[in-house]
Amino acid sequence: MEETMVHLTVDIGGRPGVDCLGFCAYCYFKHAKDVPPFGCRYCLPFMKGCDYCSRGVKEEYSGFLPLQSVAESFLADLQMVTGEVTRITISGGGDPSCYHEFRDLIEMLGTLDIPLHIGYTSGKGFDDPEIADFLIANHLTEVSFTVFAADAELRRVWMHDPTPEASLEIICRLAKEIEVYAAIVVLPGVNDDRVLTDTLAWLSDIGVKGVILMRFANHPEQGLILENTPILPGQRVHTVEEFSNLIRDTAAAFPNLRISGTPLYDPRFDSPFAIRKIPELLDRLPIVNKKATIITGAVASPYIRTVISARSGDPSSVVAVDKEIACLITIDDLKSLHLPDLCETVILPGRAFVHDAEAEKVLSRDG
């Protein structure tokens, strides 16, 4: 029998905007209000609010966790493992580069000779390029690093990075030895066009494996649900079509980089919903023979309609709310629906922030 491979996560805690040397100018947690729990499918039937739809969505911690607590929690998880631990991922609400006991944590984990992965860092807490050599020596094999731009001054202004030159040098050193994946929030007129081209060229030259381009969000319909809009007053945002085209064009221009985007698109697999263009896989889906309304976000709706139509379903049964991302739908989105257009049976996105009992009440208010 093959031994099970196990990935463990080390949660260091931390607060967005606090334990990261301050908010980046474009951070979607900036100005976030202490909103009440949204409710979701994981809540108890009689009570709205659980860890997922309250603390989880806000990445709410009291601060970085002490190293002793982190170590004790990790050791407890390690003792429960029956298979081989093949990767340890460091994550949290704050930025690992700003963790006050970061070196001690890395040294502790490094003694295990298990590949380390930093799930995300802006690098703002690193001020000496030597940290790259230290990380490599302690078995770091993969890191996701927010770049924004290869221009140090743009990093300084928009990410509030006090030592942007050091951060860029660290990315460069790491990319020569391990798998580095870059994340870039794209602001039209700031770091797109020539700036983006120069940044991607630099990332390709130094050996970065992949880049995820992230569309900036500035309005509630784009997924800002913490009553914190606008993030940047007056800042333009790419339309979904513009952003999809941007991903397609940059991926074609930089074939050595694995480029994808969020909330869409992945040129390599033509996703999301790549199945829509693979007839042999579509044929495995059952024929639609009953009526129901599928509520989803504006981004997913045309793709779902294509799949439903391919299996003899009615594309009009797919109803899009104004919210673009389906898993960020809230009860307010359901309140805006025209109830006569809905079937008796309604299917909601599984990760939507909607309590089942509240959804039933809102969707049946016309009797």
Descriptions of predicted regions:
Residues 1-53, 345-356, 360-367:
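Flexible, acidic/Gly-rich N-terminal and inter-domain linker regions that tether
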Residues 102-118, 165-179, 233-257:
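Alpha-helix-loop-beta-strand connector modules within alpha/beta enzyme cores
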Residues 94-98, 124-125, 150-153, 188-191, ...:
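Short acidic, S/G/P-rich loop/turn micro-motifs used as interaction or catalytic elements
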Residues 127-133, 188-206:
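Catalytic cores of alpha/beta
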Residues 2-5, 197, 201-367:
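Auxiliary Fe-S-binding modules of radical SAM enzymes
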Residues 9, 31-105, 109-127, 131, ...:
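Core AdoMet radical
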Residues 15, 93-95, 121-125, 148-150, ...:
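Active-site beta-loop-alpha junctions enriched in small/polar residues
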Residues 170-195, 216-219:
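Conserved strand-turn element in the central/C-terminal portion of the radical SAM core barrel
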